[in-house]
């Protein structure tokens, strides 16, 4: 998995990253090891459709019941994926942060994983809040798959700095503001 900065910014001023996916992937291997042991339905997010598709292929090959929710998912099937996940018919909901990170409820899960994070902490917080909603009965565990010294690590540190600055400006010390 290789991330390259395109030197361009999206409409929110966040760097646009180009992802080259490679197999084998240590990150995907670590995720699959973790996924074998995790209990209950799991929500998985990434910025990359390619990463979601790779994970979906691996999970499908392992016999897991999966739903994929990206910008490429037809509108007519999006709600059925959410409904199936909420009804316990799927083990994994895999989605991109942009497509699935806002406006949907995934409270049947109390476990969430991120392959990578958006540059903007608000997008990440919105994605996290898909499980932190009215109707959630359990504490939610959030797992990030990243390695030190990588772009993922840089994104993580940038988001931590952005939250710290925001808290300083607002005078708010609550987690996630």
Where are these regions (language model features)?
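Short, acidic/turn-prone active-site loops that include or flank metal/cofactor-
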Residues: 70-74, 116-121
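Short amphipathic alpha-helical segments
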Residues: 55-57, 104-108, 125-126, 156-157
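Short, well-ordered beta-strand core segments
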Residues: 93, 112-113, 131
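A short beta-strand element within the Helicase C-terminal
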Residues: 104-117, 140-144
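A conserved SF2-helicase RecA2
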Residues: 119-177
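Conserved Helicase C-terminal RecA-like lobe
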Residues: 1-93, 98-104, 170-177
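A structure-centric signal for secondary-structure junctions around beta-strands
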Residues: 39, 89, 109, 137-139
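Structured loop/turn residues at secondary-structure junctions
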Residues: 47, 98, 118-119, 147
